[in-house]
Amino acid sequence: MIIKQSSNVLRKKRHLRLRKIIIGTITRPRLNIFRSNKFIYVQLIDDNAQNTLCSVHSKETNVIGSNIKAAQAVGTLIAQKALALGIKNIVFDRSGYLYHGKIKALAEACRQSGLQF
């Protein structure tokens, strides 16, 4: 009998493959995304110092839920915090999620707010 792996296990495998390549530094930190059923969490991470520079989650915004509007609000908020720290260039880590829907909306909101990746 063939047992199919869950989509979360497959996502974690993709994430581990990507993490071998993607490394954040102090000048170009890694934008890490975690998407739960209710909320979206985003962090800017310096992997060399193993330090989180700033973080934002959808609970901080006025938009309720984990939809595309919440992702756009989180994207603009993390971009504002990053620009306040003097960070303009980042490395985008999609954490194994497919690049569509909420992840794409968050990335485009970051780009429109002034971040480059």
Swiss-Prot record:
SUPFAM superfamilies: Translational machinery components. CDD domains: Ribosomal_L18_L5e (cd00432). One of its GO terms (biological process) is translation. Keywords: Ribonucleoprotein, Ribosomal protein, RNA-binding, rRNA-binding. GO terms for cellular component: cytosolic large ribosomal subunit. GO terms for molecular function: 5S rRNA binding; structural constituent of ribosome. Pfam families: Ribosomal_L18p (PF00861). PANTHER family: 39S RIBOSOMAL PROTEIN L18, MITOCHONDRIAL, LARGE RIBOSOMAL SUBUNIT PROTEIN UL18M. Part of the 50S ribosomal subunit; part of the 5S rRNA/L5/L18/L25 subcomplex. Contacts the 5S and 23S rRNAs. This is one of the proteins that bind and probably mediate the attachment of the 5S RNA into the large ribosomal subunit, where it forms part of the central protuberance. Belongs to the universal ribosomal protein uL18 family. This is Large ribosomal subunit protein uL18. It comes from Phytoplasma australiense. The lineage of its organism: Bacteria, Bacillati, Mycoplasmatota, Mollicutes, Acholeplasmatales. The gene is rplR.
